[in-house]
């Protein structure tokens, strides 16, 4: 009986520790970007991530990064690109896996995807870098018209440096597709990922 009471008392501390690590990583990422971007923590107007927000996460943050200086995009317009950063934490890796299975049924762009399988075209999606690590999901959404391939690679590298590890899964989404699993992709034939 004492063990059960001890476990019940310990559970909130463990969950707090997991969310605290994600908060620290997010804070580090935002601090690295603070010289170039104006950063706002927002409650609404988050990009459409499919049904991810319907999953049972224990912690969620959303930030918008708007570039301070204007730049010329590939269409020749002077713009201040904006980027969206969303982070989600789950109770444990099993909860994350359950959430991913649910999310993949209606992924970004309302596309049903199979884990580990790439897709060439997905209409109405913005470029994004998704890092799935431990019990967290971190998503950085970029602009189709303000992002070139070099900038995309820089963002991917920065995201991996802060939110990733050698075991992190990385999903990259281009403007209107493709969706590519570029690091530690799951085996599409693995029965653990079957719906």
For each of these PLM feature ranges, what is it?
Residues 15-84, 89-195:
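Soluble, non-membrane globular domain cores that form compact, hydrophobic packing
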Residues 3-16:
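Sec-dependent N-terminal signal peptides
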